[in-house]
C-alpha cells in the first residue's frame, strides 16, 4: 500500500498536536478526517475559541468532528464512515475501545516521555521538575490501560539545566512530528516490532506524571535550592510556580515566578 492510499484519522487538540498533523499533510499522507475537542469560550469576553488543531484543519479543508462524548452513537457512526486504516492520537483524550479498536491497523499515540516512565497527563512538566537530564518521545499502540500499550518507537532528547518546560515542549513537538511519520512508514512497510512495556529495561523506579493543579504549583521553600530551581523551570511559563508574599499589615499577595538563577547549591 502507498502512503496516499492509507486512510488516516488524526486526533489532537493543542499546539503540540499541530506539528505532527502538519508534517502528515505536507508529506502527502491521506488524512481523511480530524477529531478535536469542542469549541470553548475563553478570555474575559468568553469568546468561542478554536483549538489549534481545529484552526489548522480548517485551513487545510480537512473533514472535522468535535464530539462531546466519544461513545456517542452518532459520532461513532460518523467515524466509521471515514473508513480509517489507521488512527493517530496526539495530546487528546482517553479513547474508549469502540474508537481505538476500530481501524484495521490499530491506533497509536505519541506520548511526550520515554515510556514506561511518566505515564499520565503532564510528562514534560514532571521530567523537568524532577531534574531529569534526559526525556524523550514514544509512539505506542493503544490498549485498555492508559499509556501502557506496546511501544513502537522512541527518541531520546537531552534536557539542559537551563531548559524550562516550554523549551523542552518545543523540542519534543518538532521531533514528535518526525517520529509520527517514521511510525506511519514502519506500519506501512510492515516493519513494526512492538515491545511490551513490562519487557523494557528501566533505570530506577517508575515515576508517574499526574495532572498538575494550582496547589501543585505552590513553592515549598523548605526544599533544597536545586529542587526549587527545577520546580520553577518545570512549571514555566505555564501554569507557573507561585508563592505568597506576606506584609506587616497582615495582607498578602500571590506572586508567580517564571525564572530563577542558582546562587547556592
Say what each PLM segment does.
Residues 6-9, 83-87, 216-217:
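Short active-site oxyanion
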Residues 7, 30, 61-63, 106:
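Conserved beta-strand segments of alpha/beta enzyme cores
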Residues 41-85:
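N-terminal glycine-/serine-/threonine-rich beta1-alpha1-beta2 phosphate-ribose binding loop
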Residues 1-45:
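N-terminal Rossmann-like dinucleotide-binding module
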Residues 18, 22-26, 76-80, 97, ...:
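Amphipathic, non-transmembrane alpha-helical secondary structure
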Residues 27-30, 37, 86-208:
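Donor/substrate-binding cores of folate-linked one-carbon enzymes
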Residues 13-16, 68-71, 91-94, 263:
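Short beta->alpha connector loops
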Residues 201-265:
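Internal anion-binding site segments
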Amino acid at each position: 500500500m502507498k502512503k496516499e492510499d492509507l486512510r488516516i484519522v488524526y486526533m489532537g487538540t493543542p499546539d503540540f498536536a499541530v506539528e505532527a498533523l502538519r508534517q502528515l499533510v505536507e508529506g502527502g499522507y491521506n488524512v481523511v478526517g480530524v477529531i478535536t475537542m469542542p469549541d470553548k469560550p475563553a478570555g474575559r469576553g468568553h469568546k468561542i475559541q478554536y483549538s489549534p488543531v481545529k484552526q489548522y484543519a480548517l485551513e487545510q479543508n480537512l473533514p472535522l468532528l468535535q464530539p462531546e462524548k466519544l461513545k456517542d452513537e452518532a459520532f461513532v457512526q460518523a467515524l466509521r464512515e471515514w473508513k480509517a486504516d489507521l488512527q493517530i492520537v496526539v495530546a487528546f483524550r482517553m479513547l474508549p475501545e469502540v474508537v481505538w479498536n476500530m481501524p484495521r491497523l490499530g491506533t497509536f499515540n505519541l506520548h511526550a516521555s520515554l515510556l514506561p516512565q511518566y505515564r499520565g497527563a503532564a510528562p514534560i512538566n514532571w521530567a523537568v521538575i524532577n531534574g531529569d537530564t534526559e526525556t524523550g518521545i514514544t509512539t505506542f499502540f493503544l490498549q485498555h490501560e492508559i499509556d501502557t500499550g506496546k511501544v513502537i518507537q522512541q527518541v531520546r532528547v537531552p534536557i539542559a539545566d537551563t531548559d524550562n518546560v516550554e523549551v523542552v515542549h518545543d523540542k519534543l513537538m518538532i521531533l514528535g512530528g518526525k517520529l509520527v511519520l517514521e511510525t506511519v512508514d514502519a506500519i506501512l512497510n510492515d516493519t513494526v516490532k512492538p515491545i511490551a512495556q513490562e519487557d523494557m529495561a528501566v533505570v530506577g523506579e517508575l515515576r508517574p506524571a499526574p495532572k498538575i493543579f494550582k496547589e501543585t504549583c505552590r513553592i515549598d521553600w523548605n526544599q533544597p535550592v536545586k529542587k526549587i530551581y527545577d520546580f520553577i523551570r518545570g512549571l514555566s511559563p505555564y501554569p507557573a510556580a507561585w508563592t505568597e508574599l506576606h506584609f506587616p499589615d497582615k495582607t498578602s499577595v500571590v506572586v508567580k515566578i517564571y525564572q530563577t538563577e542558582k546562587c547556592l547549591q
